[in-house]
């Protein structure tokens, strides 16, 4: 799995370099930049290192930041009892079934129906659930949610999405700098620095927004895989039951708080335009995919 992911990463970066080379050749940008003292290869390497570096720093800090920002209380199995002990035991059993190292397990207090997995590697991961999820879902549904999150860990989704984000970061940095430099040459010398600075900021924001559509697309494909993995671990019916409970919570007109919480999670949404930025496919599509699968 690791070699396959690295191979995909290398292939993606080769395609990035080839695409940039073709674009610069067709537009005649390369000689123009060289004539003005900008080395295209050096800029590309710089953007790649910073883009990937930022993505991996975020990955390395992901577990720490999640605990701090979400207020996750990690369960100590030596002193846990009641619902905490039951939750820990469920994760332990599912992790053993998936042949995974035991992750840290935590609970954070929030009315939203949510759970997530994070961490830089399979051996250093965290699975956390909200108190709202534990209050809303029954045992079978909780089992499905936990299996889904552990499937993310087993599939290496945190690393995969980091690689994709790093490539997008590199693209954003590279093209925003190239275009901002080209725009700055169209004004007087004394205004070039200001134009280049402002254009770089505006283009970086614009390209980042467009790049997030690409990242969200890949994230949605990983969600389907995690659903399939969760179905294998906990059973298809448990996985479907969990998603159906989420859908009922989201669709309940009297529960606007639950609707807002799920919309914040980007689990689903009624705005077709915003669906491009959603990291999760529509719940209806996920349920249908599971019902049509053979798990």
Curated annotation (Swiss-Prot):
Instruction: State the Pfam families in the record.
Output: Peptidase_M48
In terms of InterPro entries, this protein maps to: HtpX_protease, Pept_M48_protease_HtpX, Peptidase_M48
Which residues does the Swiss-Prot or TrEMBL record annotate as the active site? Answer: 149
List the keywords (alphabetical): Cell inner membrane, Cell membrane, Hydrolase, Membrane, Metal-binding, Metalloprotease, Protease, Transmembrane, Transmembrane helix, Zinc
| Protein's GO biological process | proteolysis
Membrane-protein topology? Multi-pass membrane protein
What would be an example GO MF term here?
zinc ion binding
GO CC entries = plasma membrane
- What is the first-listed, main subcellular location in coarse terms? membrane
Residue stretches spanning the membrane: 6-26, 40-60, 163-183, 198-218
What domain of life? Answer: Bacteria
Q: Where is this protein found?
A: Cell inner membrane
Q: Where does Zn(2+) bind?
A: 148, 152, 223
The reply on keyword Protease is: yes
Question: Which cofactor does the UniProt annotation name?
Answer: Zn(2+)
Q: Does the keyword Transmembrane apply?
A: yes
- Note how many cofactor molecules are bound and how: Binds 1 zinc ion per subunit.
Broadest EC class assigned to this enzyme: hydrolase
Its Enzyme Commission number?
3.4.24.-
Its family remark reads: Belongs to the peptidase M48B family.
- The name this protein carries in UniProt is Protease HtpX homolog
- According to its UniProt entry, this protein's organism is Leptospira interrogans serogroup Icterohaemorrhagiae serovar Lai (strain 56601)
**What taxonomic lineage is listed for the species of origin?**
Bacteria, Pseudomonadati, Spirochaetota, Spirochaetia, Leptospirales
């Amino acid at each position: 799995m690791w070699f396959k992911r690295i191979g995909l990463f290398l292939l993606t970066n080769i395609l990035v370099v080839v695409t940039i080379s073709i674009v610069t050749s067709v537009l005649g940008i390369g000689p123009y930049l060289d004539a003005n003292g900008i080395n295209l290869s050096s800029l590309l390497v710089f953007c790649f290192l910073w883009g990937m570096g930022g993505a991996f720093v975020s990955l390395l800090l992901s577990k720490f930041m999640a605990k701090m920002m979400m207020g996750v209380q990690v369960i100590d199995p030596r002193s846990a009892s009641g619902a905490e002990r039951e939750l820990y035991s469920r994760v332990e059993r599912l992790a053993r079934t998936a042949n995974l190292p035991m992750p840290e397990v935590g609970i954070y207090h929030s009315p939203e129906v949510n759970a997530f997995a994070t961490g830089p590697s399979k051996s250093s991961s965290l699975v956390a659930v909200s108190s709202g999820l534990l209050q809303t879902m029954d045992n079978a549904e909780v089992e499905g949610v936990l299996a889904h999150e552990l499937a993310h860990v087993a599939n290496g989704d945190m690393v995969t999405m980091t690689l994709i984000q790093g490539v997008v970061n590199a693209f954003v940095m590279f093209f925003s700098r190239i275009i901002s430099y080209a725009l700055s040459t169209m004004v007087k010398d004394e205004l070039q620095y200001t134009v280049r600075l402002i254009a770089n900021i505006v283009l970086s924001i614009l390209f980042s927004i467009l790049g997030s559509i690409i990242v969200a697309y890949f994230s949605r494909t990983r969600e389907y895989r995690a659903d399939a993995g969760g179905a294998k671990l906990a059973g298809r019916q448990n996985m479907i039951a969990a998603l159906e409970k989420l859908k009922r919570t989201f669709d309940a007109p009297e529960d606007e708080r639950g609707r807002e919480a799920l919309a914040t999670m980007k689990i689903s949404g009624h705005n077709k335009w915003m669906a491009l930025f959603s990291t999760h496919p529509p719940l209806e599509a996920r349920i249908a995919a599971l019902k049509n699968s053979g798990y």
